[in-house]
Regions:
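Charge-rich, low-complexity N-terminal segments
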Residues: 1-145
Length: 145
């Protein structure tokens, strides 16, 4: 079965959910992703999302089609879709990293490394910078249970 990695960005809708609703959504996605053998990491910075999904290509495409139609965000932009060998983000079925809600030390590291405005880290556009942010977020998750 072809394994793939899909990365996209989007902007939260004005009537975005509360933190509790967001965490409940991540829990539900984790359950769904486990059944579909999909791994994922969702990064939130201000009102911007960056998400990576890895798994069977058909399953990842099905999930992405649902994501595109989800009214909780807009301006969904596909950054990368590629076949993969080993997965980079297979530690979780879904994990959320809110860059605004990081511990101070971690937040300062991210602020030194990435462009930010008014305390909000701007999500990068270049693919190598996107991978850098995703892998830094993964490392942060691995260091914090």
């Amino acid at each position: 079965m072809n394994q793939c990695r899909l990365i996209y960005s989007s902007i939260a809708s004005e009537k975005f959910m509360s933190q509790e609703e967001l965490h409940a959504l991540v829990q539900q996605c984790a359950q769904n992703n486990t059944r579909a053998k999909i791994a994922g990491l969702l990064v939130l910075s201000g009102d911007r999302f960056l998400q990576v999904l890895e798994g069977p290509a058909k399953a990842v495409n099905r999930v992405f089609n649902k994501i595109i139609l989800d009214k909780r965000h807009h301006d969904v932009s596909l950054i990368s879709f590629e076949s993969i060998g080993p997965a980079y983000f297979d530690n979780w079925s879904m994990r959320l990293v809110d860059l605004y809600d990081l511990p101070m030390e971690s937040r300062q590291i991210f602020m030194r490394k990435y462009i930010h405005e008014d305390g909000v880290i701007r999500l990068p556009e270049r693919l190598h910078e996107v991978y850098s942010l995703l892998l830094d977020s993964k490392a942060l998750c691995l260091s914090v249970p």
